[in-house]
């Protein structure tokens, strides 16, 4: 790209900034996006720099600009409309340019995000009601399934017998924050935002201890109701295997209503719900596969698809159905039932096993699964609508945490995770707008991700919280005392053990690169050049070892070959390890005593003044052990 084009791109950004400052009007993300260079894909850093440039200049950046009116949500339900005349400026080339085709993920994300309308308070309530209705339908449907009833009973027993942790059964966060109201305080400093969850967040173990008795009591009641329902269902089916008999049972319906109310009060862990759904969906897939196989078999005998569906769907597949189809007027059905009698008997037996496992007739089970799937789709679609409409909120919060160790897109993704949690736990009846509620979750997700991922060497989040507390106290004491407080003073202020304070302050140090330049000159070298290598051999030691090796070889050469070999093996000279008398004896095929005698004789020869004076000079400088030849003089 030529220099003139680059200057032109910079002029567009500066022009937009100058106009916004002079007219004291805010800009939108679309304005910045259009002002970015079109002839090349801007990097994430360029987008961050552009956003920060406007923020530093005091220009507000809003999420959207629709029909020349920008709606700002202030507090709960107040809305102020600010009229902007940006589109009325004919000389503004920024507004006239089109984004065009691009494969840059940042631009595509902003473009798609801008295509979703913002939600009013009424829209948020309507979507929240859709989510609530879908959940209620799913809960009621699950409670009608004997599979779920058996799971509730097993979960209660595992919880009482300590085979299951409470956190594995329920959603602790939903219970932890049930009585909390997160405030959307925009005046919090960035430092406080990064640390606020430290004082407000209870540990999982503490929360479990607090709510465990209440959950056990509820699960005990649920387990008892489930046992009553299963017994009542068994009695009804023993009298008559007809669904209407059970549906008309007053006792069964009363207990079922109680079960639905109790289960609705507990926020079960998503994994526990998926466990029940997984079992039901698995059985449903088996049924579908059996029906498809039966349909293909029927088509081979000339039964049309529509005729098969008319006779199969809604019918109870048993021996009576088989007899009925034998009397069918259509020849194809008679031929199918007659020739495939064994296959149909086997299928009836398999369906009977499924009915026994599910506690429901096949048709009732399929209807129940269809209802659950429909409510699940309804809930997911409503959540999707709420999430997509609030993606702008994530960006507005994420930009405050730029240059904290994570890239801008990573901050957005972490914020989106917090947004999804906020949608799951949003309670519209409290009267707050969703943005007020979601801000806390988005901020928590981003700060937790920065604490968990921003450092080169990962530090656990709970340790990050302790580091922040100590650093904050250190700054406060610096302002009070006028000098840097010592570790002892910080420990006394926080009532924390001195060793822990020192350990945390040591961990808090940021790692630096060994390639960092030292000094102002280019020839000053790198930091790694000044760090001692503990494993490297000093030149003087290397020279001594080389000389010792040569002298030892000459001294041992004065012995007989057998004596030299025995000493080398016994002391590991020139070998990887030393050898025992037994091992040396096996090599020479003699006894241990004979090897000891040879060794003693050889050592006496080495202690002769003529030979020993050549090794005496190494006795003070050499290291003992590990095959050091100077050890021969001590033996």
Swiss-Prot record:
A motif (Interaction with polymerase core subunit RpoC) lies at residues 410-413. Residues 177-204, 609-635 are annotated as: Disordered. GO terms for cellular component: cytoplasm. Transmembrane segments: none annotated. Pfam families: Sigma70_ner, Sigma70_r1_1, Sigma70_r1_2, Sigma70_r2, Sigma70_r3, Sigma70_r4. PROSITE patterns: SIGMA70_1, SIGMA70_2. Keywords: Cytoplasm, DNA-binding, Sigma factor, Transcription, Transcription regulation. Residues 465-542 are annotated as: Sigma-70 factor domain-3. Residues 177-191 have a biased composition (Basic and acidic residues). Its main location: cytoplasm. Residues 555-608 are annotated as: Sigma-70 factor domain-4. One of its GO terms (molecular function) is DNA binding. InterPro entries: RNA_pol_sigma-70_dom, RNA_pol_sigma70, RNA_pol_sigma70_r1_2, RNA_pol_sigma70_r2, RNA_pol_sigma70_r3, RNA_pol_sigma70_r4, RNA_pol_sigma_70_non-ess, RNA_pol_sigma_70_r1_1. Belongs to the sigma-70 factor family. RpoD/SigA subfamily. Sigma factors are initiation factors that promote the attachment of RNA polymerase to specific initiation sites and are then released. This sigma factor is the primary sigma factor during exponential growth. This is RNA polymerase sigma factor RpoD. It comes from Rickettsia felis (strain ATCC VR-1525 / URRWXCal2). The lineage of its organism: Bacteria, Pseudomonadati, Pseudomonadota, Alphaproteobacteria, Rickettsiales.
